[in-house]
Swiss-Prot record:
UniProt signal peptide: 1-26
One GO BP: axon guidance
The protein's name in its UniProt record: Netrin receptor UNC5B
Domain Ig-like C2-type: residue ranges: 153-242
Oligomeric and partner information: Interacts with the cytoplasmic part of DCC. Interacts with GNAI2 via its cytoplasmic part. Interacts (via death domain) with DAPK1 (via death domain). Interacts (via extracellular domain) with FLRT2 and FLRT3 (via extracellular domain), but has higher affinity for FLRT3. Identified in a complex with FLRT3 and ADGRL3; does not interact with ADGRL3 by itself.
Highest taxon above the source species: Eukaryota
Domain Ig-like: from-to ranges: 48-145
Residues carrying a glycan: N222, N347
MF terms in GO: netrin receptor activity
């Protein structure tokens, strides 16, 4: 009340000073002369301008805060707090003169005490603002809010001690006490402040948690969460983290020698628990440190002589012989050989003949034996030389013959490449000649006849050879045609004719661009035959889409397939434009091989080009055919490396901070947040043989049948839009039509085959040509998911062309599992018009490329408000974490916590999920449950809820 009376008295005083009591007559001066109607007026004084405005302040304990205001030109400055004028006595005023302008500068100061702030009732904070007067009017300053600063003593959540194995992730949670201003949080490791910029193994999340990416032995320490603001500093209880190492066995040592050198014994081997040794309380190695086994060592047997043989007849040299062998027993198992001589001789004439009488063990007593050995060795040497000479002669003959054939093949391959031919001595190429690109097709003879004189591009280097394999090169290439030129037309650069399709397996079309011969072959030499080269080529429009995107983002979609790529706003750097594409790989060879109970659950999808810099994750959506039941599946995402082999990216529910992506699994699709573009496929592995795949069964028949035979094709496909679309396109080329709407079938991991059979055939007019009662598709053909258009054909025959009605039942079931029955009734004379065309040409969404704001359901202004409101951690948990929980995206929150805007990434994922819905109801419901009513008002104002 006193403040108001003071202000009134000040205003009254100002009015009295400005009031002139002297009356005056308009247009008459004091002498009675008529005055002019107007005088030149002085320039009007400007409105007050604030040089200093009051700033927000906090009252610490009982110390009042000072608020300052400075303005010019100003005759008066007063403070107004919470709508009431502050007493003039509480103002401290200073005046000065601005030397530059000569105007008077007025500065006012007041103090606000804790008591004044506490006496305020209501939800609004205590505020003050300045009001400055001049002769031209008044000006108000900004509002300055004054709050009582505090910091509670108790933490909402304190870190807990943990024992973790080496190289595992560690999460220490901390929720600081409530305070004004909001407390800043830092972590201490053994009383040293943790700086993630210096040690990247540490990560501080946006909600103040500490994450150790891979625990090291050096990370064993005491960790403390510290919260501080201008009032106080609080420390949490210390959490001790122990990084332990479980012991591991070393390799087994070699087996020791057998304990007995002869007969039965024992031998053992040992290992030590040192690979690694247990540390910090880690578990000791499980198992035995040594192994013992029985051994049997075969005893050695020494050789012994047999009895001497009888003496031989007396020879011309007056001697006879006898022999013995070391065979009683022979030496075995390392036993000693017999000692002594093999042969023995003596004079057989009782001394009548003494010529050359020597014993055989005398080396000089066998001159004939020595000469015989020399002759034998000489003969062997001569034989070796003869064999070598014959082999060399044969080799020379074969080499010359191969050279002639090779030269002819080179000539033929050059002619095939250049379009020319030889008028004489033309030899048909061998079918197995690897130098020819197209051995089974005749050369292109549209070029002028004669021998080609220009350079020959025979593609003989290893980098130029195009292998004839089932690699991904053969399937996606769209009609690579090679133009060939004669020497007479090289100068003009025009080709004479188009060559045959490369490898003879490509669909019709032309190679992009108008290349000359040299440029084209240079491209073949420099380009890689891997996936990166193929991605630049034109593709089937039904399985490929591309677009140019900037920083505003957009969406690529393949209609009728469930495959899309969402590029969020800000994912592409400012000022850059990327040509992005999305492609479904149809070839079976582009799918990874299934091992064990693994199965391919989605199509192989390529988004590219790879290696682009992305500022935030993009969202790739692919359909899958898994019946999602918790605990039945082990899901994996795999990517194709540059060498063509597949590598695991992530196993769901086993993510760590180093995982480069996040998978949001829905009932029939999977949304993948990616930092890198590439080729991806979603796979699953049955856990304890309880997993179930969703299949769809489709029956096709010929649209027009003019013969007695009639066939039914029963397809067993993965329950994805991609699989059905491929079969519809295939049947359209075969002239078939869909007899009945596809039906679902649950296929269990039970090793049981899929059985198909026909029933209730009208035998009076039809008969089945199938000898057996049923057909079966092996379990692994269905389960692995890598075989496209899997089907069985039932061939029937009608007795006459007059039989145009056909009815039967088709039963498809898994042995000891579920099944489906089709009741068919068709008229052969009626051709269903356009049934497949309607299915193939009417996808759920015909738009393939959406750019900028048109691709998103949430307007950018609403998105920014939601992010600014939910990104900051809230002690009540009413932030992005609760939003993720409400939207069922909280499977691994640490992925979002590492992003600059967790809310933005969650909204990107929501955008990918809501591609077909097109409204904001689910998001609005989540925000309403969170109590974010101001966001609902913004959505109702700016959006189209």
């Amino acid at each position: 009340m006193r403040a108001r009376s003071g202000v009134r008295s000040a205003l009254l005083l100002a009015l009295l000073l400005c009031w002139d009591p002297t009356p005056s007559l308009a247009g008459v001066d004091s002498a009675g002369q008529v005055l002019p109607d107007s005088y030149p007026s002085a320039p009007a004084e400007q409105l007050p301008y604030f040089l200093l405005e009051p700033q927000d302040a906090y009252i610490v304990k009982n110390k009042p805060v000072e608020l300052h205001c400075r303005a010019f030109p100003a005759t008066q400055i007063y403070f107004k707090c919470n709508g009431e004028w502050v007493s003039q006595n509480d103002h401290v005023t200073q005046e000065s003169l601005d030397e530059a302008t000569g105007l008077r500068v007025r500065e006012v100061q007041i103090e606000v005490s804790r008591q004044q702030v506490e006496e305020l009732f209501g939800l609004e904070d205590y505020w003050c603002q300045c009001v400055a007067w001049s002769s031209s009017g008044t000006t108000k300053s900004r509002r300055a809010y004054i709050r009582i600063a505090y910091l509670r003593k108790n933490f909402d959540q304190e870190p807990l001690a943990k024992e973790v194995p080496l190289d595992h992730e560690v999460l220490l949670q901390c929720r600081p006490p409530e305070g004004v201003p909001v407390a800043e949080v830092e972590w201490l490791k053994n009383e040293d402040v943790i700086d993630p910029a210096q040690d990247t193994n540490f990560l501080l999340t946006i909600d103040h948690n500490l994450i150790i990416r891979q625990a090291r032995l050096s990370d064993t320490a005491n960790y403390t969460c510290v919260a501080k603001n201008i009032v106080a500093k609080r420390r949490s209880t210390t959490a001790t983290v122990i990084v332990y190492v479980n012991g591991g066995w070393s390799s087994w040592a070699e087996w020791s020698p057998c304990s007995n050198r002869c007969g039965r014994g024992w031998q053992k081997r040992t290992r030590t628990c040192t690979n690694p040794a247990p540390l910090n309380g880690g578990a000791f190695c499980e198992g035995q440190a040594f192994q013992k086994t029985a051994c049997t060592t075969v005893c050695p047997v020494d050789g012994a002589w047999t009895e001497w043989s009888k003496w031989s007849a007396c020879s011309t040299e007056c001697a006879h012989w006898r022999s013995r062998e070391c065979m009683a027993p022979p030496p075995q198992n390392g036993g000693r050989d017999c000692s002594g001589t093999l042969l023995d001789s003596k004079n057989c004439t009782d001394g009548l003949c003494v010529l050359n009488q020597r014993t055989l063990n005398d080396p000089k007593s066998h001159p004939l034996e020595t000469s015989g050995d020399v002759a034998l060795y000489a003969g062997l040497v001569v034989a070796v030389f003869v064999v070598v000479a014959v082999l060399m002669a044969v080799g020379v003959i074969v080499y010359r013959r191969n050279c002639r054939d090779f030269d002819t093949d080179i000539t033929d391959s050059s002619a095939a490449l250049t379009g020319g031919f030889h008028p004489v001595n033309f030899k048909t190429a061998r079918p197995n000649n690897p130098q020819l690109l197209h051995p089974s097709a005749p050369p292109d003879l549209t070029a002028s006849a004669g021998i080609y004189r220009g350079p020959v591009y025979a593609l003989q280097d290893s980098a130029d050879k195009i292998p004839m394999t089932n690699s991904p090169l053969l399937d996606p290439l769209p009609s690579l045609k090679i133009k060939v030129y004669n020497s007479s037309t090289i100068g003009s650069g025009s080709g004479l004719a188009d060559g045959a399709d490369l490898l003879g397996v490509l669909p019709p079309g032309t190679y992009p661009g108008d290349f000359s011969r040299d440029t084209h072959f240079l491209h073949l030499r420099s380009a890689s035959l891997g996936s990166q080269h193929l991605l630049g080529l034109p593709r089937d429009p039904s399985s490929s889409v591309s677009g140019t995107f900037g920083c505003l983002g957009g969406r690529l979609s393949l209609p009728g397939t469930g495959v899309s790529l969402l590029v969020p706003n800000g994912a592409i750097p400012q000022g850059k434009f990327y040509d992005l594409y999305l492609h479904i790989n149809k070839a079976e060879s582009t799918l990874p091989l299934s091992e064990g109970s693994q199965t391919v659950l989605s199509p192989s999808v390529t988004c590219g080009p790879t290696g682009l810099l992305l500022c935030r994750p993009v969202v790739l959506t692919v359909p899958h055919c898994a019946e999602v039941i918790a605990g039945d599946w082990i899901f994996q995402l795999k990517t194709q490396a540059h060498q063509g082999h597949w590598e695991e990216v992530v196993t769901l529910d086993e993510e760590t901070l180093n995982t480069p992506c996040y998978c949001q699994l829905e009932a029939k699709s999977c949304h993948i947040l990616l930092d890198q573009l590439g080729t991806y496929v979603f796979m699953g592995e049955s856990y304890s043989r309880s997993a179930v795949k969703r299949l769809q069964l489709a029956i096709f028949a010929p649209a027009l049948c003019t013969s007695l035979e009639y066939s039914l094709r029963v397809y067993c496909l993965e329950d994805t839009p991609v699989a059905l679309k491929e079969v519809l396109e295939l049947e359209r080329t075969l002239g078939g039509y869909l007899v009945e709407e596809p039906k679902p079938l649950l296929f269990k991991d039970s090793y049981h085959n899929l059985r198909l059979s026909l029933h209730d055939i009208p035998h009076a007019h039809w008969r089945s040509k199938l000898l057996a009662k049923y057909q079966e598709i092996p379990f692994y053909h269905v389960w692995n998911g890598s075989q496209r258009a899997l089907h069985c054909t039932f061939t029937l025959e009608r007795h006459s062309l007059a039989s145009t009605e056909f009815t039967c039942k088709v039963c498809v079931r898994q042995v000891e599992g579920e099944g489906q029955i089709f009741q068919l009734h068709t008229t052969l004379a009626e051709t269903p018009a356009g049934s497949l065309d309607a299915l193939c040409s009417a996808p759920g969404n015909a738009i393939t490329t959406q750019l900028g704001p048109y691709a998103f359901k949430i307007p950018l202004s609403i998105r920014q408000k939601i992010c600014s409101s939910l990104d900051a951690p809230n002690s009540r948990g009413n932030d992005w974490r609760l939003l993720a929980q409400k939207l069922s995206m909280d499977r691994y929150l640490n992925y979002f916590a590492t992003k600059a805007s967790p809310t933005g990434v969650i909204l990107d994922l929501w955008e990918a999920r809501q591609q077909d819905d097109g409204d904001l109801n689910s998001l609005a419901s989540a925000l309403e449950e969170m109590g974010k009513s101001e966001m609902l008002v913004a959505m109702a104002t700016d959006g189209d809820c």
